[in-house]
Amino acid sequence: MQKEALRYLQNAKELLSKTAIEEGIYVDKKYVKSACGVAYLGVLEAINAYLLKRGVPKKDLPKKVEEYEKALKKYATIHNGKLPRLFDALYEELHIAGYYRGMLHRVDTVRSALKGAREFIEKLK
């Protein structure tokens, strides 16, 4: 359900509110990493809900990023051919750069990534 995916984004914003900002940069990267991870989970939750609505059995939902890419190409390209590319960008920004490597520090960069996640989720109605 899209509502649940958006709740993940709200949780990500709450995590970010726990760290100070100095000169446009988040001070505590632990909260930034956590927020990026939670936001990415929201994206995955939205895809799962979309696939379930399209008749994909719960046991057949994707478990790896490559499987999510294939599922989007198979089920969502008809409605919006840009979704697989947007998903790839969110995977790289939120999961890899933000969560896994902890490379996102600037407030505007993180906010832009969260905005992109929200837009992606809203396109999966």
Model-predicted regions and their roles:
Residues 1-125:
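Terminal alpha-helical segments
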